[in-house]
Amino acid sequence: MPVLHNRVSNQELRARMLAESEPRTTVSFYRYFTLSDPQGFRDDLYRTLTALQVFGRVYIAAEGINAQISVLQSRFDAMREALYAAHPQLDGLRLNVALDDDGKSFWVLRMKVRPRIVADGIDDPTFNPANVGHYLKAEEVNALADDPQALFVDMRNHYEYEVGHFDQAIEIPSDTFREQLPMVVEMLQHDKDKKIVMYCTGGIRCEKASAWMRHNGFKNVYHVEGGIIEYARRAREQGLPLKFTGKNFVFDERLGERITPDIIAHCHQCGAPCDSHTNCRNQGCHLLFIQCPVCAEHYVGCCSVTCQEELSLPLSEQRSHRAGRENGMKIFNKSRERLQLSLTGEDSAQK
């Protein structure tokens, strides 16, 4: 029986991917549907995608599938047909092909079974996730963008909103979708008669959010079909003006797709115009933040003087510094105060 998980080091896998001569295509997709045996479905699909040399991140739950993958261009059609055949509910699945792609987005296939394909924190047995809002195509999005009675609501995290968003969209200031759902209901409680247009990267979050809004008494709820990725593609194909400004953050090695030339964010260290996310080079920190080329050189890719100094230590000393440190993804919003302190070296005692 084949091993149904990766057993090769990330370093070696990344080197193999970078050595490939054939270009890859980055694709994202999701679908809400009922799976009676998520683990069995996961294992079967893992075998199929591994045979096709597909890399990426795939989450499977009883409520469906959520995936971001990369595939060799010569195997794209075979991958698509394999997905369509994997389950009757996946036949005709929409595949969001990346807009700004160097083919280096993933180098390993990771597939996990989870309680939900997107963590929503909803624990209400009366909630019907199928009762979604109206899907909007690109031309309909633009029409509503010019409608003073329409409110565009960004259902992405703050660091995604920071580098790009629909014009005049409302930010739900949080780091997680789970936190945003109760927040958006509260923030818009006096706007139930308005047209609520929800959007996200590829559609998975705003689709569920639209059902949640309807569950909470909002009547005129819409969501952008296929998210920002599909909207931008269709708008360009149809010659429509883009109502989204800046960059679309993505959760892979690219960390962003350029939608318009506008740079609306700023370096988190010096304040210069910049929308390039990076992770702190200090592996004991790995903070996600925006850093301009000047600061990248000055801080050697680190988020702070403290991390820069720690990175210069022998590996054994770096490991001792990391011991007991909080694990998990760190992003600038949660670490703003620490970052400001560490830029001046004042948080050394905390490290």
Curated annotation (Swiss-Prot):
Domain of life: Bacteria
Enzyme Commission (EC) number: 1.14.-.-
Disulfide bridge map: none
PROSITE patterns, A to Z: RHODANESE_3
Gene3D superfamilies linked to this entry: 3.30.70.100, Rhodanese-like domain (3.40.250.10)
Pfam families: Rhodanese (PF00581), Rhodanese_C (PF12368), UPF0176_N (PF17773)
Keywords, ordered alphabetically: Oxidoreductase, tRNA processing
Residues annotated as the enzyme's active site: C200 (cysteine persulfide intermediate)
Catalytic activity: uridine(34) in tRNA + AH2 + O2 = 5-hydroxyuridine(34) in tRNA + A + H2O
Cleaved signal peptide residues: none
Cited CDD domains: RHOD_YceA
GO biological process, one term: tRNA modification
InterPro entries: Rhodanese-like_dom, Rhodanese-like_dom_sf, Rhodanese_C, TrhO, TRHO_N
Sample GO molecular function, one term: oxidoreductase activity, acting on paired donors, with incorporation or reduction of molecular oxygen
Chain ranges of the Rhodanese domain: 146-240
UniProt cross-references to NCBIfam families, sorted A to Z: PRK00142.1-1 (NF001133)
HAMAP family (alphabetical): TrhO (MF_00469)
Family per record: Belongs to the TrhO family.
Protein name in UniProt: tRNA uridine(34) hydroxylase
